[in-house]
Structures are given as C-alpha cells and as structure tokens.
C-alpha cells in the first residue's frame, strides 16, 4: 500500500493549541508598550466621531481586587468595541488621591502631623504614598490588558487638577449654590471630621430604647384641648428615642398634624400618645390598666409647651411630616443639632440648632454638671439615671437596630451641628434642575434612573467641607469677626489667584500663602478657611477638571460613566451635582452600573470567610483573557458570581473558541487572499452559507456590543463556534479541505469562507479576549495593519439570498435532518458501525410538503458529504414509513433514517467506503475520486 499522506492538504499552523496565557500575555504586553499601541490607535482613529468613557477614579490605596478588575475590564471592552465601531474612543485612567484613608496610612507609619513633623511634611508624605499606590495599581490594570494612556493618567493630586478643583468650586460659588451654616452632619469622632453620605455604612448596634415623659407647662390648657378640664393628675407628652445622649439638645417635640392623639389615664397620671400606638406603648411600659379619655388631631396640640425633664427649660410641640407610626409613641424627640429632619423642622419653627458635643464626641463644658466632658456613647447610662431621678423615665430596654458607622473606622458616628460649607440643593434650584437632567440620561440598567431620582429628591444639602490635612483647600477667606465670606467678586478673584499658585506648587501653596499677597491691606480683617474639600468633590468635579481640560477629549463631554451600583450615591451623584451647579447640565449621556462580586454560593467576598478571588492569582494561573471572558460572560446587571469552578468553566469556553480559531488558521495554510480568493458567485453553496452564518452572527454580536450586553456577545460567539461551525460546517469541510486538489476551486472556495470567517471572528473576540485576538491576528494570511485594534468590524461578509433555491431556510432544514440522522448513527455503534464513514444511510420519506427532500436530491452525490457518510440514498415510501421513525416537523415532512454498513472497500486516503477502490491500475488501493484529485482534473463541488 502506498503512503498518500503527502498528497493530502493537512492542516498546519504555528498558532499553538494551548493558550499558555499566563506565560504568553506578558510578552504581548511588552510589545504593546514598546510599540505604543495606545498611541497607534489614537493616530488611526484621529478625526473619527468621539466616544468618551470617563474613568471613575479608584482610590489610590491598596492592591486591586476582583471588583476593580470587573470595572476596568468592562470599560476596556466598551472602549475597544467603540473603536471597532468607528469611534475615536480615548481612555484616560484616573486615581482619587486625597482624603482620609491615605492620611490614616501615613499616620500609622509616621504619626499625626504636628507630632514629629509639620503639616506640610505630612502632605508631602501623603503625596508620596499615593504615588506608590498608583504605580502598583497601574501595573495590575495594565496586566489585565486594559489599553489607555497609562503614561499620562489623571490624578486628583496633579497640580493642574488640584487647581481646577478650586476653580470648579469658584464657579459654583459664582452661581450662588454655596452657603455656610451650623447644620447637623455625619460626624466621625475618630476622623474628627464630617463625612459625606457615601462615607457612611450601616451596621447593627445595640442601643437603649427609652420612653420619656415631658410634663405639660400649662396643664389646664392641654386638658382643655381634649375637652376634659376635670382630669385629675399631671399630663405629659411621651417621646421615644434610641439616642438618650441627644436629649440635652432637645428643643421641641414633633407631632404629625393628621394623626389622632389620645389622652390616656394610667397609674394616676395622663399621658398623650398616638392613638394607633397606645396598646403597644402600654404593653411596653407595663401599665396594669389604662383608659383612653379623649382624642384630638396632632394639629390641635401645636405650640403647647412641655418641660424638659432635666435641662430646666420648656419646649414646644411642633408639627412635622417626618413623624410616623412605625415605632415609638407618635411624638418625636427633636434635637435640631443632631438630625437632618430635626434641623429642617427646627428651621421652620425658628428653633435653636444646639450642639453641646465637641469634635471628640464629648459634651462641651456647661452642658450639664454630670455630663460635661463625657463621651456621648458613654453618657446614655448617665442620662437614663437622670431621667429616673426626675421621675420622667417610663421605660427602658435594649434594642438592636441599624446604625450609621464610619466607612473607614467601622465605629458609630453621630449627627453633630458644626460650622460647615454646603452646596445648597434648593437655594438656586439645583435639586429640580438635577432631576430634570436625570431624565435626559440613559441609565443602564434602567432601574438606575428611579434610584438616583429618589436619592436626589430626598438628599439634604451637600456638606463639602472637611477638617482634614490631606485635601484640596477650599481656598476661601472669611471676616475674622463676622465669619462672612469675602465679597463675591473678590472671593472669585482670590480663588483664581490661589488656583494659579496651586497649578505651579500644588495644594501646599495655599497653606504657605500669606493673605497679604492676595488681599493686601484687607488681610488683617480676614482669615483663611482651614477646611479642605470632600474627596467626593475632587472626583465629582473631574468632568470639568479633567474631561474639559484634557486635549484628547477636544472639548467633548463624557458619553459614559461606568461604575459599581453603589456609585449612584457616590460618584454619579457628586458628578451630577457639580456639573449641574456649574453648567446646568449632566456630565454624562449614559450611566452604566455593574453589580458586586460574590462567591459561587452567592456570598459576599470576605477575607475572614476565605472566599476572595485574587485577580493577580487568576492572571498568574489562567491568564487575563480568562478573567476577561468571565467578566464578559456574566450578566453584570446583578451580582457577579466568581469562584475557581466558575473560572474553570470560563477556561473551558475559551478552549472551544481557541480551537475554532486554530482550525481556521490551520486550514488557511497556503492561502493568499490576494490571489486565491474565490468570487462569491463561484463558491460552493455551503461555503456561502457559512459566510452568511458569520454575517448573521456579526449583526447580532454588534447589536449586543452596542447595547452593552456582553454576555449575549459571548453566548452568540459560543453558539457560532460550537454549533454552526464546530458541529456542522467545520466537520463537513474536512474531507474537501484535506482531499481535494490543493489549488482547486472546491478547496479555495472553502478557504475563502474560512478566511472571511476568521477575519470577522478575530474582531468579535478583540474587545473581550484581547490577547488571543492579537495572537490570532498575527497568524492570519494577507496584508494587514499590525494590530486588530486599529481597524473596524469586518465588512467583507455576504450570504445566500432568500430567493435562492438553496437558501438559509434550506440549510436550517438540512441541519435538523442531520441531527436526527446522527442520532441513528450513534445508535448503530452498538451494532458494530463505529464511524459515520462505515455507514450507508437510507433516508426514507413519505411526503415532502416543504420541498426539502426534493432539494436534497438535487445535491446528487454531494449529499453524502453533508452527512459525512460513505453512501446516502433518498427513498420515497409511497405507502408511508415505519412507526419507528424520526419525526422531522418543518413543513410536516416525516423522515426515517435507516443505517446499514457501507458497501465496498475503505479508501486509505479519504477513508470513504466505495466500490471503485483499486479500479485504476496506477493507484490500485485508492478510490476513483482520490485518483482524480491526485492525478486528474480533481473533483468538482457545487453544493458541499
């Protein structure tokens, strides 16, 4: 027997079967860096329509975690897909560099400013620490395959950015949104600073729950309101609170105007309670008996006065919409200095915003003899004892409830009225304009709109001042005696002068500044405001300080902001507030949010549980492309589950895609698209169908990219590789590809299809599996740009026309019949027919309502190649077919596949069984088809 291996067109490629991504990717990254790939892309896209995804800056502290990876990969997928869609999509990564966490790190290592070194030296160390953190995170982000201007990122501590942050505040002041006030703010006694809403987390805390009686000043007046002048015993209004320590600051009791309030007789006294809460209160305080004497609406009790149990003054009953019947007594202890609702209602009634608590969380001198200097959380017991002594405590018990805590220290915080600077939500219509702007933004997922609308509608004024060392100074001057701001025009001019100096020397320029340098003779009357800006102001103003300022954005506003779903109350909110306050419009056109990562069981990632997944470990073991594929294949609109098992599944999917790409490349061996391409009208019909499949897939994939449905992209890509190609087309063409004459139309038609498919496939992959796409690109035949990322989606795809005889609908029917035939072939393995080529299939049919069988007959001898059998016979059964049949439902056609052993001998070259093996003397051991392909004109293929 002769060796015919050399006569076959066996697949050959240098593209490795194994990805070995962890080893190969770093080399590709080095090439990308050496070539300045990002710069090449920018040059290639110059002049195109822009799409700007503005990077929300991660905090420059610590190593990146899996959540960072999700965020950066999603951004990179969008930027790359937009580039392929014909946009110029520059990506400038950024970092948030000021603020408390960095201060704490520096304090831990060096101590607090003023202890061993000056505040200026402390700031320098903070800057140095932030820079090292940026460098560490940058390396990991680059390792993920994220393309961007990593050599020139934006940092909120860049001198130019710091200066622009000051200018942003100046614009907000000019537009009338800034005001100063003593207002309750979230206050962390450990930070010694006000906290933004985004810096507050909630944890369960056990607190004392108390019911306290405030005795009526004018007993007769209260009794008369209920129409009961003759009631015996004293009358009190009962409040309920879980913060006894705030009672020294009580200045009123709030009632709901429309609630019914009952005068209830218990144990020789009368108490006023919300009627709907009487039973629960009586049960709680343990009264043996009670009688409801009368009821009135809350509005009837307005401005009646009640005596504070121990502070020696009386307070009014006032009306507020914040009163509920969810718990308590229906009468709310109101301390305007210790709560936002209390403050708002206090302003309405002209109440004092009392704040008896210092920045360290201890009562100030003169508060109350037994409370002065005591920490408020330790004072609860003292207050309770005071109430007992005064006979005002009706009940006390412990209760667990959700309590605000500092995001950094995890310790309980307090509401504390302090002199702060605020961006007003309503003074100049910021709230209403923001709500209007929200409606013009596309929110992805769409529930994001309702979420941020609710937050904006209900949020208090934004406290933007902080009492910190490492931050952008507010750069304001106030009068030493009145604390009034420098007149507006002079304030704005002074801020611009400060900004110019900061642009040269950084924020330290403010602290080094002698006011005389700017204010001249008036310097003696004014002092510098020592406060720094909330870090959310830093990042929130980047639409102005970065997007408007960077030349690559060419004055265009950001198209998209993309962050985790917690940023509705964080960066999305602060960015919206600042942009609307400055310019009257939203800083973004689209806002996309992704969920948080959880483990395979849906649990939150936690070092204590030990269920965290390190992106560095994943990249070192599996490669960044596996991590990227996992991100893309997960529906980011909800929680994103990740575990070793889930990543293993991603690796399995990756292998299927890689194997498809390798098959394409290996079978393009020897193909030159410039000389070997077959015109569409001359191609084998099945090959045109395959290219059409790619065209349909591309339309769906591009639509999914456009909608940011990346898991749909992956699913469609997998279906194309595994189902349409892997289990149908690529199997069928192996015979033609390997055995036909190398330069025949039959084979070149096939290679033409593979070439078109590969050109499209590599681009579909590029935004997600960037390293692998770059690798594939290097093995594709033909002249091309150096990188796939500089081009656009492949536009060379075509397909079958609907009015053609052998159109897509026909091939859909064929695929269905083939699936049924394959099941019967599988069944026959038990009868000794081990491979499809050992089989002869007789396809019996009784009717042909949709004409599929008629068309199959027209394929003639080529039909067997579709079913990959040695013989294939189509037989009409006029009397119907056996009951044991395979039902094929399209057009009500019923078919039955009968499998028998193929006739003839096996050809050692093509492995088909045929009766003409050995008929040609010169090639006595191969079939006539193979003889023609070796020594003759070669077989002709029209259909398959």
UniProtKB/Swiss-Prot annotation:
Catalyzes the attachment of isoleucine to tRNA(Ile). As IleRS can inadvertently accommodate and process structurally similar amino acids such as valine, to avoid such errors it has two additional distinct tRNA(Ile)-dependent editing activities. One activity is designated as 'pretransfer' editing and involves the hydrolysis of activated Val-AMP. The other activity is designated 'posttransfer' editing and involves deacylation of mischarged Val-tRNA(Ile). InterPro entries: aa-tRNA-synth_I_CS, aa-tRNA-synth_Ia, Anticodon_Ile_BEm, Ile-tRNA-ligase, Ile-tRNA-ligase_type1, Ile-tRNA_ligase, M/V/L/I-tRNA-synth_anticd-bd, Rossmann-like_a/b/a_fold. It comes from Salmonella typhi. The gene is ileS. It is found in: Cytoplasm. ATP binds at residue 607. A motif ('HIGH' region) lies at residues 58-68. Its cofactor is Zn(2+). GO terms for cellular component: cytosol. L-isoleucyl-5'-AMP binds at residue 563. This is Isoleucine--tRNA ligase. GO terms for biological process: isoleucyl-tRNA aminoacylation. Zn(2+) binds at residues 907, 910, 927, 930. SUPFAM superfamilies: Anticodon-binding domain of a subclass of class I aminoacyl-tRNA synthetases, Nucleotidylyl transferase, ValRS/IleRS/LeuRS editing domain. One of its GO terms (molecular function) is zinc ion binding. Its main location: cytoplasm.
């Amino acid at each position: 027997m002769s060796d015919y291996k050399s006569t076959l067109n066996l697949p050959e490629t240098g593209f490795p079967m194994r990805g070995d991504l962890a080893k190969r990717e770093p080399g590709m990254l080095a090439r990308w860096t050496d070539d300045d790939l990002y710069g090449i892309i920018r040059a290639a896209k110059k002049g195109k329509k822009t799409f700007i995804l503005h990077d929300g800056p991660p905090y420059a502290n610590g190593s990146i975690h899996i959540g960072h990876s999700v965020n950066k990969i999603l951004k990179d997928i969008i930027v790359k897909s937009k580039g392929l869609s014909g946009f110029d999509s520059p990506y400038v990564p950024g970092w948030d560099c000021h603020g408390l966490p960095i201060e704490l790190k520096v304090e831990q290592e060096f101590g607090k400013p003023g202890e061993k070194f000056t505040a200026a030296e402390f700031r320098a160390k903070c800057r140095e620490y932030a820079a090292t953190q940026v460098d560490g995170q940058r390396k990991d982000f680059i390792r993920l395959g994220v393309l961007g201007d990593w050599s020139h990122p934006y940092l909120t501590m860049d001198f130019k950015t710091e200066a622009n942050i000051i200018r942003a505040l100046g614009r907000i002041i000019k537009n009338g949104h800034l005001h100063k006030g003593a207002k309750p703010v979230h206050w962390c006694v450990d930070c010694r600073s006000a906290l933004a809403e985004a810096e507050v987390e909630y944890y369960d805390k056990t607190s004392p729950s108390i019911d306290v009686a405030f005795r009526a000043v004018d007993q007769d007046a209260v009794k008369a309101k209920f129409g009961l002048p003759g009631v015996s015993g004293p009358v009190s209004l009962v409040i309920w609170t879980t913060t006894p320590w705030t009672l020294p600051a009580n200045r009123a009791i709030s009632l709901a105007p429309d609630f019914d309030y009952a005068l209830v007789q218990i144990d020789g006294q009368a108490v006023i309670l919300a009627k709907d809460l009487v039973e629960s209160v009586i049960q709680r305080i343990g009264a043996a008996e009670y009688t409801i004497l009368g009821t009135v609406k809350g509005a009837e009790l307005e401005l009646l006065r009640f005596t504070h149990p121990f502070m020696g003054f009386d307070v009014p009953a006032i009306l507020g919409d914040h009163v509920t019947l969810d718990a308590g007594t229906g009468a709310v202890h109101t301390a305007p200095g210790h709560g936002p609702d209390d403050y708002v209602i206090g302003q309405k009634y002209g109440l004092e915003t009392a704040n008896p608590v210092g920045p360290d969380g201890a009562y100030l001198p003169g508060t109350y003899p037994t409370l002065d200097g005591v920490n408020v959380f330790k004072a609860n017991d003292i207050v309770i004892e005071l109430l007992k002594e005064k006979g005002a405590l009706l009940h006390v018990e412990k209760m667990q409830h959700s309590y605000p805590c500092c995001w950094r220290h995890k310790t309980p915080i307090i509401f504390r009225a302090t002199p702060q600077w605020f961006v007003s939500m309503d003074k100049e219509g910021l709230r209403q304009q923001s709500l209007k702007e929200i409606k013009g933004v596309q929110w992805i997922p769409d529930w994001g709109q309702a979420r941020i609308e609710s937050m904006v509608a209900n949020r208090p004024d934004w406290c933007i001042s902080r009492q910190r060392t490492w931050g952008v100074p507010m750069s304001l001057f106030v009068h030493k005696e009145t604390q009034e701001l420098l007149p507006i025009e002079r304030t704005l001019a002074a801020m611009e002068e400060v900004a110019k100096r900061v642009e040269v020397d950084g924020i330290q320029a403010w602290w080094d500044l002698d006011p005389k340098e700017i204010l001249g003779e008036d310097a003696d009357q004014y002092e510098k405001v020592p406060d720094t800006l909330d870090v959310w102001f830093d990042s929130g103003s980047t639409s102005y300080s970065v997007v408007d300022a960077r030349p690559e954005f060419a004055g265009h506003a950001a198209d998209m902001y993309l962050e985790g779903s917690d940023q509705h109350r964080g960066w999305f909110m602060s960015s919206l507030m600042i942009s609307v306050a400055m310019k009257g419009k939203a800083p973004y056109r689209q806002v996309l949010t992704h969920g948080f990562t959880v483990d395979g069981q849906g649990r939150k990632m936690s070092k204590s549980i030990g269920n965290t997944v390190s992106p560095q470990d994943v990249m070192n073991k599996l490669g960044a492309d596996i991590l990227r594929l996992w991100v893309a294949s997960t529906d980011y609109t909800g929680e994103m589950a990740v575990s070793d098992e889930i990543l293993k599944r991603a690796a399995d999917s990756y292998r299927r895609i890689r194997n498809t790409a390798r098959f394409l490349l290996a079978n393009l061996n020897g193909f030159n698209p410039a000389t070997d391409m077959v015109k569409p009208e001359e191609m084998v019909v099945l090959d045109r169908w395959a290219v059409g499949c790619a065209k349909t897939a591309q339309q769906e994939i591009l639509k999914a990219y456009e909608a940011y449905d990346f898991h749909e992209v992956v699913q469609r890509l997998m279906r194309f590789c595994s189902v349409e190609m892997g289990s149908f087309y690529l199997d069928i063409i192996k015979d033609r590809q390997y055995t036909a004459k190398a330069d025949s139309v039959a084979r070149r038609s096939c290679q033409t299809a593979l070439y078109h498919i590969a050109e499209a496939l590599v681009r579909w992959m590029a935004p997600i599996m960037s390293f692998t796409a770059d690798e594939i690109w290097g093995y594709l035949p033909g002249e091309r740009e150096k990188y796939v990322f500089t081009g656009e989606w492949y536009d060379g795809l075509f397909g079958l026309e609907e009015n053609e005889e052998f159109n897509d609908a026909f091939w859909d029917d064929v695929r269905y019949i083939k699936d049924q035939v394959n099941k019967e072939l599988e069944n026959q393995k038990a009868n000794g027919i081990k491979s499809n080529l050992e089989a002869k299939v007789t396809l019996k049919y009784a009717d042909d309502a949709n004409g599929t069988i008629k068309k199959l007959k027209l394929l003639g001898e080529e039909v067997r190649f579709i079913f990959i059998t040695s013989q294939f016979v189509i037989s009409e059964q006029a009397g119907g077919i056996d009951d044991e049949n395979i039902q094929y439902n399209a057009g009500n056609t019923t078919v039955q596949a009968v499998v028998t052993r193929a006739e003839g001998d096996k050809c050692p070259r093509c492995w088909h069984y045929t009766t003409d093996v050995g008929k040609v003397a010169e090639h006595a051991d191969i079939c006539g088809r193979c003889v023609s392909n070796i020594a003759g004109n070669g077989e002709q293929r029209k259909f398959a």
